[in-house]
Amino acid sequence: MIRFNIDTNSKAAVYRQLVDAVTEAVRKGSLKAGELVPSMNALADELRISKETVKRAYNILSKNGILEARQGKGFYVADDSTKDSVSVLFLMDKFSIYKQEIVHGFHQVLTVKSEDTMLLFNQDISLFEYFINENLGRYDYYIISPHFSLDQNTQEKAMKIIKRIPNQKLIIVDRLIPGMIGNFGAAYQDFENDVAIGLEQGLMKLKSIGKLNVITLPASLYGSLIQRKISGFCQENGIEVEFMSCAPEKVRKGDAFLVLTSQLDPGLISLVDNAKGMSVGTDYYIISYNDSPIDRVVLNGLTTISTDFNEMGREIARMVNAKTLWKKHIDFKMNKRNTF
């Protein structure tokens, strides 16, 4: 029989330690669906704590859907395999147009009824931790976009917090935290390397132009990673590259731009304004980073390099439908339209 370790000298309440210990055992598979857990009396005696403390922990675990009480038999690890609906917590850094595409794709493919909750943590690790603490054990699936500051301490803290969620309930979207392992689900892009895959699909034209002007946002979370890969790609292929934080005042005929900010940000708008009198796609060229449905009509078709956010949502829905989790890197490509 599994043993739980409780530290009565810890600042953490004993009942909370027990809740976390049982949740972790379920996450790791040490306790399996349908398995009987120790009775309240037996566990109280084993841990030398009060029965009321065990009762409080078991009640919380039952409320959170981790355990279920069976009349006259005791507490068992909950088995949700026969449910005809799922509860889903979308825990997103922000609800951008791209996150909307993920959610839209998810519901296009999902074959069971879902009860969704969405919480936004704005890349704030403390708020993220609060949301996890408040909602641990309450949902069938936790779909998380783990975008935080890239410093080591924050990344390690994020990983530690996320690992509190049972693997079989955890699905990561958009980004994998380096070094994070486990049998959780994931549908993601590779922020450091994918940009080269997209640019490769326009290589012949870029070589004929000879130079790529990159309009970037200095505060972008992954800007430095993406810029480093762009620099390497251009160097390897003999293409001159220049990075700028805003659109140039004068756009010259033959200029090619990669806009790393959103298609609705000032970078693209200023660029088009400063190129009045010239025809985009003929006199000068624009590639935008990240694709959304509106790009099909912007400038009669805005060329993008992007992962497929809709497919990302579809892939995680396939996991929920199959009740089996896996990891998949979503294809990154150039969507060729009017502007390039």
Task: Show which residues each predicted segment covers.
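Extreme N-terminal segment that seeds HTH/winged-HTH DNA-binding domains in transcriptional regulators
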Residues: 1-45, 133
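Hydrophobic alpha-helical segments within soluble ligand-binding/sensing domains
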Residues: 176-213, 290, 305-325
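Flexible loop/turn connectors
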Residues: 255, 263-340
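N-terminal helix-turn-helix
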Residues: 32-69
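Alpha-helical recognition/docking segments in bacterial nutrient-uptake
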Residues: 78, 83-197, 256, 263
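Short beta-strand elements in bilobed, periplasmic/extracellular small-molecule ligand-binding domains
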Residues: 110-122, 212-216, 231-247, 255-256
